């Protein structure tokens, strides 16, 4: 229907460039600067420091199983090019040839309805629904465990009882699900679901990335530095959201503080109106805050014990891989 593989490879954007090119001008939404800075931060967050990934790694039987599981997940992620990207290009070609305007958020389902026979269509839609449910339930469980263990249980010591913790976890999941349902209609005000997700991750991921990486690799990192980093990231994320979505309000705030005539759209359009670039600046700012606060404050006795345990565990021989496991791991890396 689309002219074969050659026609798909030859697909071009409305601007005339190849739809498969990763090299774009600086002012492009996915310009080369954005790819090298902000998109890398999102990759680290999405596949290294996100809560549901960390939960799975920490629940592994040994370091060997954790590493091999991560490699398997990385291999499966490569398939996303064929599962997500290529069907999108095919949909763009197919519906353009048919003279139809297609909402990008509906491309995948519309393509399945158009090309799959009825029986396979039911199986594909069932698989898509199962994948969505799996992703949603992982996110809800991860968020619920964070809220229940790190906030509720610390304020209510009786919540450490397993039955109470389970009850609080269920209530938290229900509250998060209701909030998500109420928030869903507002997503249509953004330029598509994908752009909405990229915007949120670009603004909210930086403090999480910095806090987790500092906790793993920076020996002087402490809770005060982490709290300061999270607060800084949230504040800068709100500022970045206003700057990206309502530059008129942002310019008015800047003018109120004496910078008359300042315009984000006119003066810094090529950089500051790209969500990935803003996310990278927030990451750098959070890293600076983490370093300054951690250097200027002392670790508690409990934090010192935890840090020593982490760095000691890295040198411990108790959980080192056997020669056979090392060989398999190296082979998997290659």
Task: List the predicted regions and their residue ranges.
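Membrane-embedded helix-loop-helix hairpins and adjacent transmembrane boundary segments
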Residues: 1-334
